[in-house]
Amino acid sequence: MRLKSLILGAACMAALASPAFAQSLTAITGGRVLTGTSVIENGVVVIQNGRVVSVGTGAAPAGARIIDARGKVVSPGFVAVDSGLGGSEISSVGGSDDLSNGANSISASFDVSYGLDPWSFTLPVARLGGITRAIIVPSHAGGGGGGHAHDDSDFAGVGDGGLQSPGLFAGQAAIIHLATGTDILVKPRVAMVAPFGEAGAGIAGGARGAQFTQFKETLAEVRLYARNRAAYDRAGLRDLSLSRADLEALIPVANGSMPLIVTVRRAADIQQ
């Protein structure tokens, strides 16, 4: 019963992300409110213009839409990170998976936001669990495959088909909300994603050292391209290993304006 109350309370919070509530004044009253640092019995959570403006006790503001949460638990919405919600239905069915790309000329420039499905059956299921936002992370289409005990091929989306893309990068992540409606995208291209560890080593040729060398060389090429676009346009620049689309996508990473999400499993890889 307690689990049901928690789910119902979390679902209430998810509903508040809906555009219908975006410009309204709403109060959730009577519930057991978990703030993250304390527990408020018979609490009142006030939301105005889509944002929580107060959490406490007492009466709801005059004119507020009341959501009765008596007998329920109200908690902040959860954020799912490293998620495929809305981008993949069944991972084993290729036609339903828009999280990876095998084209040789598109790796860093791959943008998962174009493949998001607001009608995905995964969204309402996650919403019932209290998830209100998610970071949708692309998976790399290539990798070493492999079948030994420490294989990372299932991490960062590396498939069994072997190397499909020469790029070290899986693509660009996006943020979505899980409210009902057709526009679930909050922000596209929020971060670049790159698998490291054994998965990344397989992409680079089999060794971690090779991946780090290739990674540094790639960023050097991106900086060279960014300084010499005109020369690149007139074929006056040396051959570069990436397509123009990938070079453009990596400029924000090279200059520090876009975060880089690195996926690893081993402590030694994190320390690198």
Model-flagged regions — what are they?
Residues 1-8:
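Bacterial N-terminal signal peptides that target proteins for export
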Residues 9-17:
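Bacterial N-terminal signal peptides
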Residues 18-22:
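Sec/Tat signal peptide C-region and signal peptidase I cleavage site
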Residues 33, 37-75, 92:
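Histidine-rich, glycine-flanked metal-binding segment
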Residues 57, 78, 88-93, 145-154, ...:
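Short, solvent-exposed loop/turn and secondary-structure capping segments
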Residues 100, 104, 113-120, 206-209, ...:
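Soluble non-cytosolic domains of exported or imported proteins
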Residues 127-272:
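Polyanionic/metal-chelating signatures
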